Amino acid sequence: MRHGNSGRKLNRTASHRKAMFANMAIALIKHEQIVTTLPKAKELRPYVEKLITLGKRGDLHARRQAYAALPDKVWAAKLFDVLGPRYQERQGGYIRVLKAGFRHGDSAPMAVIEFVDRDESAKGQDSGPVHVEGDEEAA
């Protein structure tokens, strides 16, 4: 019996789940809206909402907890500089999950997970290094 056990396993090991949610949280903080499967979105929501609450607190211990949970320090800093002040007056409910139909390949239910009162300009922001032709010659 699994009384009191919350959370989905999502067919992954504990370390894989931890890394996946950390990376998805970074993507959500960076772009403020991502598309994923519905079960992943439902599991990601409390993970990120707790990080936003840390951003609202803003003290040193909260920063250290956020840096421990997120692998990229640049986007962890956005929690405290942008998102924390934005949601200072809101008592929870920083994220919404919208159903987005089914994926063609395997009919998996898809969802859009986004911040409430999100910044529209953050969507499609730079996603990291891009392969450029000619770099192989220099190496």
Curated annotation (Swiss-Prot):
Domain of life: Bacteria
Region of interest: Disordered: 120-139
Transmembrane segments: none
SUPFAM superfamilies on file: Prokaryotic ribosomal protein L17
Record organism: Parvibaculum lavamentivorans (strain DS-1 / DSM 13023 / NCIMB 13966)
Encoding gene per record: rplQ
Protein name, per record: Large ribosomal subunit protein bL17
Record's GO cellular component terms: cytosolic large ribosomal subunit
One annotated GO biological process: translation
